[in-house]
Amino acid sequence: MIRSYFVPVCILAFLGCLSSASSSRAQEPNRPQQPMVYEGTVGGLRVIEEGQPAVMIHATVEDMKRFRQGNPNARPGSVQPASTSNDLYYHGGAGGIGVETAPKIYLVLWGSQWNNNDPSGEAAILENFYRGVGGSSWLNSVTQYCQGVATGTFTCGNSGTHAGNQTGIFAGVWADNASSAPSKPRQSQLAAEAVRAAAHFGNTTASSNASVQYVIATSTGNNSSGFKTQYCAYHSSTSSSYGNVAYTNLPYITDAGANCGANFNGLGPDAGITIVGGHEMGETITDQFPSTGWLDSGGAENGDKCAWISSGQGASADISLSTGTFAVQSLWSNAFNSGSGGCVLTYP
């Protein structure tokens, strides 16, 4: 498949029934646990490094496939009893922050390994995607989620402060290539690079990082341990003198081949780059400091619930932005299907 890009000038549990008559519900722990459908917990919260905050992992294609094969109720299109709900609900936030109300995305190309070493052109693809995605109908489903509401809230309505989807959410790129990145960077090293990026971009206060995410992208062959076998990417946060800093570990996605999206759904060899990059971006906007934002009762975020769907409602597809054509997965919308919830490629 031929894909078009504009070169820049200079990256579980589901489908239930939600009552449309109520704007919020009691906290989830007080509700009886019900059979979960549509996805499951193959992705979600994991401890990657002792002493570090847990991360939200993006499951691989094969892990998701095996999970769905072993859990008939977790397959797309499954039906569950009307008494259950697998929609996202608010987990209270951290320091009053649960979503990114005016998102800013910074791309960090970490390490001298990037120098003349980008065989798939991932840097340009990511930059073009981030430059064009703000304000798109694909990302707009994040705007139904909010902060400043009670823990356990399912529907914001006009309450709280909603997540944003403004144009121009891409705030800059930093080629941090003066020295090499660790050959297999640990989570603590990735977190430290995110803090360095905050300083580089002048975000040195808690307020300046309150709606910001840093995508730490590593070059080919320079990926963290567990990539392509345990996960495709993950996002987390770290505390610093600049406040809490949200970041994504984005390895060189095409190194994983089909297990992280190459040719997924016939979308081309580079499809996984923006499927995974978009997944992490959408999750960070709605759960900036995991897992205090919007998740379901199984601990899945809006991207986890819709990962690697190949047919039917929510199947991954190409979208057209002003900066090119890019493959994306769908994102979970509580509002879909009159409040029953589901995976959507456009909103409203």
Each model region followed by its residue ranges:
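Positively charged n-region of N-terminal signal peptides that target proteins for export
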Residues: 1-4
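Bacterial N-terminal signal peptides
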Residues: 8-19
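N-terminal zymogen propeptides
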Residues: 20-92, 100, 110, 134-140
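Mobile, glycine-rich extracellular loop/lid and propeptide segments
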Residues: 27, 88, 98-113, 122-127, ...
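Active-site-surrounding "flap" and adjacent substrate/cofactor-binding loops of secreted or lumenal enzymes
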Residues: 104, 113-176, 296-297
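Structural recognition of the beta-strand scaffold that forms the well-ordered cores
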Residues: 104-109, 138-148, 155-157, 168-172, ...
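Active-site-proximal segments of metallohydrolase catalytic domains
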Residues: 156-238
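Catalytic cores of secreted/periplasmic or lumenal enzymes
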Residues: 242-348
